[in-house]
Amino acid sequence: MTAKTNNMILLPDDAIVVTNYNDLDRYLDKFAEGSLDLVLLLGKPGIGKTESVKQALGIDDCRQSETLYVEGHAQPFGLYQGLWRYRNNPVVLDDLDRLYANPDHVRILKPLCNTRRAKRISWLSNAVTGVPELPTEFTTTSNVMLIANEWRSLNGNVRALEDRMIILWFKPTVEEIHRKTAEWFDEPEIYHFVGSYLSHIPQLSMRHYERAKRLRNAGFLDWKKSLLQMMLSDRTVAVVVGLQLDPLLSNETQRIKQFTAETGLSRATYFRVKA
């Protein structure tokens, strides 16, 4: 399979680009109802991929779910046991980036991700003898969702999986991420502060809001300055903007002195960036 580049991210040619949460929910709802049997969801960290999937499938961390939800740190034999216990139920494998790298995981994923309705999964080792009810092979009709931050073809087995999947590249704009965050984030001061800088933020993460909340609640008066350094890719711009927000600096002379101390750059650079 060839690949295309989307803002420096390598993607399979047949990836479907999804740019808003409403459209993402349409695909997730179809998966939840069983209409889509095999989906690979790609997207950068901090945009709510996992939360959206859990909401669509009714997965609640506080109670038992009918969906098998597996994170990347799971061991291969543990994955096999989970697939047996949840056979014929939906399966979500999160953090596929880790699972990719383990050949034992890939050997399980290859038959699991077969496009046939009934898929035969096997574990050919003595480990199953320690779990009396666990067979060495079984058949399941589970539909499967794989979640990853990036797409990588490490070997032929992985490429074989890609050829079978509906591949979604979730790429919401910073405005869309900000809008979605309003549905759950309950700190107006932080929310509106982030919103005032959206046009300058190249890549927004929902984690930025939570980090700012932790800094502010810990008593850091300069939490806004710290947040800008996290969000803005140009550190010089972040420093200049942060200096305007520093309550301990009351005039330009103090700000310029602090700017040159932090960056080693000149007074002229300070005014150029500020402009």
Segment roles from a protein language model:
Residues 101-141:
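Conserved catalytic/switch belt of AAA+ P-loop NTPases
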Residues 2-35:
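N-terminal pre-Walker A segment at the start of P-loop NTPase domains
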Residues 95, 124-131, 141-152, 171-173:
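A short beta-strand-to-loop transition that corresponds to the Sensor-1 phosphate-sensing loop
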Residues 181-234:
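Conserved AAA+ ATPase small/helical "lid" subdomain
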Residues 155-176:
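A short helix-turn-beta junction within AAA+ P-loop NTPase domains corresponding to the substrate/partner-engaging
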Residues 33-52:
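Walker A/P-loop nucleotide-binding motif
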Residues 28-31, 234-253:
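Short, amphipathic alpha-helical "recognition" segments used to contact nucleic acids or chromatin
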